[in-house]
């Protein structure tokens, strides 16, 4: 009875490991949450006959005469000019060597060792050496260019704008998604309502897709199974 229970436990454990190896690994999106924001409606003014009204209607289309039209409220749009060009390289090397040599001799050889050293003076010499050479290197580069219009979804207490946006492009039977989020200083916004991505704080840029091309880049369940079980 105990033998059958042991076999059952072993088979169950192997089945659990097999299912773990076949499990699909979900990808966590870099830009989370909604990718758009709607303007916040203002309070409704009450006609009480007074010149000063505590609740004034918000005119989102209002533009001062001597001021550029720049985003300042939730729901305003802003164009991000993607200019990401990052490269990094690293190399390392290590060398180590050690040599040793020892000489010693016997003027008199014991009788039971004469068959090994002979009857004459015995000289013994030992030497050894150890050498290690190691090298390593890594190179990485990333280039991303384009434009993406985002929406202000939060106005921070210091006046900075938190923006978020998404662009979807359908090509044949696949869809490409470009998502962006970050914090923009209004002073860096140009007169054409654009700001380079290099001047955006806490920037999150995500470029993903779905369809046959994206599925071809993913590892199959059988390959993941053998990869998890392989000791190499």
Curated annotation (Swiss-Prot):
InterPro entries: Flag_Lring (IPR000527)
Record's subcellular location: Cell outer membrane; Bacterial flagellum basal body
Topology class, membrane: Lipid-anchor
Signal peptide range in chain numbering: 1-21
Major site of localization recorded for this protein: membrane
GO biological process: bacterial-type flagellum-dependent cell motility
A cellular-component GO term for this protein: cell outer membrane
Keywords: Bacterial flagellum, Cell outer membrane, Lipoprotein, Membrane, Palmitate, Signal
PROSITE patterns: PROKAR_LIPOPROTEIN
A molecular-function term among this protein's GO annotations: cytoskeletal motor activity
One Pfam family, short name: FlgH
Lipid attachment residues per UniProt (S-diacylglycerol cysteine): 22
Lipid-bearing positions (N-palmitoyl cysteine): 22
Alphabetized HAMAP family for the sequence: FlgH (MF_00415)
Family, similarity comment: Belongs to the FlgH family.
Subunit structure: The basal body constitutes a major portion of the flagellar organelle and consists of four rings (L,P,S, and M) mounted on a central rod.
Known function: Assembles around the rod to form the L-ring and probably protects the motor/basal body from shearing forces during rotation.
Protein name: Flagellar L-ring protein
Species name: Escherichia coli O127:H6 (strain E2348/69 / EPEC)
């Amino acid at each position: 009875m105990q033998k059958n229970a042991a076999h059952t436990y072993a088979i169950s454990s192997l089945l659990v490991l097999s299912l773990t190896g076949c499990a699909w690994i979900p990808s966590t999106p870099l830009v989370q949450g909604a990718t758009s924001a709607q303007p916040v409606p203002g309070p409704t003014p009450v006609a009480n006959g007074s010149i000063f009204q505590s609740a004034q209607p918000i005119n989102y289309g209002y533009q001062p005469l001597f001021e550029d039209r720049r985003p300042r409220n939730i729901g305003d749009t802003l164009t991000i000019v993607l200019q990401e060009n990052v490269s990094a390289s690293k190399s390392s090397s290590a060398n180590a060597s050690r040599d040793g040599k020892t000489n010693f001799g016997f003027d008199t050889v014991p009788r039971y060792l004469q068959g090994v050293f002979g009857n004459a003076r015995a000289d013994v010499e030992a030497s050894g050496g150890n050498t290690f050479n190691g090298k390593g290197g890594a190179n990485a580069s990333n280039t991303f260019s384009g434009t993406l219009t985002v929406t202000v979804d939060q106005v921070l207490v210091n006046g900075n704008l938190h923006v978020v946006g998404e662009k979807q492009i359908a090509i044949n039977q696949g869809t490409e998604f470009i998502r962006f989020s970050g914090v923009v200083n209004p002073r860096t916004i140009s007169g054409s309502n654009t700001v380079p991505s290099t001047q955006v704080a806490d920037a999150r840029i995500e470029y993903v897709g779905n369809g046959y091309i994206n599925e071809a880049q993913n590892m199959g369940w059988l390959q993941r199974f053998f990869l998890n079980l392989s000791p190499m």
